[in-house]
Amino acid sequence: MRPQSLRQSGRTTAVRRGCPCDLHFVTRRSLGVRRGRSVKELVEVPLSYDEALDKVTGPGQLFEVVGTEVDGHPVRVFKNAPANLGALFAGARGDEAEFIVYEAERWTFAETMRNVDALASALVTTYGIRKGDRVGIAMRNLPEWIVSFAAVLSIGAVSVSLNAWWTEAELDYAIEDSGLALLIADPERVERAHAPAHSRGIPIIMVRGDQLDPNPTGVRRYDEVVNLGDPMPVVEVDPDDDATILYTSGTTGFPKGAVSTHRAVVNGLMAFWCSSTIQTARKGEDLMGGGGFAPCFILIVPLFHVTGCVPVMLSCFGMKFKLVMMHRWNPDTALRLIESERVTAFVGVPTQSWDMLESPSFSKYDTSSLATIGGGGAPAPTKLVDRVEKGFTRGRPNIGYGMTETNAFGPGHSGDDYVTHPTSTGRARTSIMDIEIRDESGKPVPTGTRGEIWMRGPNVIRCYWNKPEATAETIVDGWLASGDLGRIDDEGFLYIEDRAKDMVLRAGENVYCAEVESAIYEHPDVYEAAVFGVPNERLGEEVACVVLRQPGSDLDADGLRDFLSKSLAPFKVPSRIAFADDQLPRNASGKILKRKLREVYFDEGS
């Protein structure tokens, strides 16, 4: 059943009311001007990036930045940031403007918050969820994902986002590792996660559960639990209380739970809004809307990923923007929705921009409402930047360099800067983050010199859940070691050139080679294996491997993929497989030379 009191059709319009968390007029307020004046009118001459940054974050502005300490380390934070995410959600209560569009359903902000309040009440009164308890969310992109997330955080519990692609074994690990008190899931994830949850006595709330009848033991349907009209429980939530755990692939073969506080998520979110305001102040380019169109995002990436959750979903929640949700990716469906809903912002991975441009139906749809076509989570070919710039009527290319560990925020690129510096990921100087390039000993290197990228800011995670050693290796004196190698040029642009971590970035999904290699070695016919990434114009990178078989084995690529599909999510299974005749090449210390294997087996002509 769907949640109660849903609008199945029709549109709702409403006057947007201001509140401490309503940043709909963020650009004008941040520059300290009347609501009736535009940024273009305010800025008589173009501003440099540094001038705009200083102006937007200066004293008295909405995005004023001040110094403070977090865990004993100095950071810059937004002075006017909400104290917690519950305060941000509360700003939507009673607002009858349209929020979520999902297939035939249209949810207002007020309807969403009625469900949030009622679910939060049920979590506390029916399930005994208390501040600090972990509640898992395992489902595809559905309105109930957003409701569940907001309800959990509003009562001071911790939202644990579980990857909807995961197998039962992968879900089992995360359920055990996070110590869930409750799981909220859709029917497909209930079937996959029921055994791991039930064996530990963890109850499940199932959304849209018409497909499962009767309910499995320990599972109750959403409509049986939620009573619309129940009030939001009152819980004191501090900025430094834990808010979210998002799992990111682990170098040891197990995913790591990245723990963010309310302060981290809120400041990361406001940093995105600040960056948009800076761009508008510089050149009058409104990255959220403009052109006579109301701001509207299309959600084309999973909510269990940090990109879908923070810069897309939470931006719409906080800024009172319409959010058009796609249950699964389809380029023609996306184009149809962009035209019919007048979508202004598209944030995904380069694969998805490429898919739309390559669609035979592309020219049939009106995409003139799009102001920005954003990318991230995978390398973007220079060719794609040029195609986006030329292929869309008004939309400008945009890219960001962020991580789960930074709540997706980091140096970003858009418009002219991106077109003129297409191989860069953006300017290293940001509103709240410090960026340094360091050598192997941890010392900063001169401008233009390559080294590991280190980042510091209030948006950085607190720790990896239950992994103190991994935390100590990655976060040092408040600085996050990214595992990426890069350089900063004399203009202040950051370039990502390689990875210190053994990882493949496939269409926004982090795939750690050690995890895949470990699974490959479980096959009895495998003697030796190496996993690495190879370039793919559509995906950014794809997973490849070279395998040396045991003597006499006739194992082939399809057989290996079938074996791996039983233990790995589909995106982790290598799409390119080669078999070696001799032992894999190694250096003097015994490390397999993956770069050489890539050149020999998967060069551009292969």
Question: Where are the regions a protein language model picked out?
Answer:
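Conserved pre-ATP/AMP-binding loop-to-beta segment of ANL
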Residues: E98, G229-Y247, F254, M288-C296
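Gly/Ser/Thr-rich phosphate-binding loop
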Residues: G318-M319, S340-G348, L357-T420, T430, ...
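Conserved AMP-binding/adenylation subdomain of ANL enzymes
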Residues: V266-C296, F304-T344, S359
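Conserved ATP/PPi-binding loop(s) of AMP-dependent carboxylate-activating enzymes
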Residues: R427-I432, K443-T474, E509-V511
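Conserved AMP-binding/adenylate-forming core of the ANL superfamily
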Residues: V77-A87, E96-A150, T167-D172
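ANL superfamily adenylate-forming
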Residues: V66-T68, A104, E188-P239, F254, ...
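Conserved AMP-binding A3 loop
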Residues: T108-A110, A243-A271
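AMP-binding/adenylate-forming catalytic core of the ANL superfamily
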Residues: W166, D172, L183, F346, ...
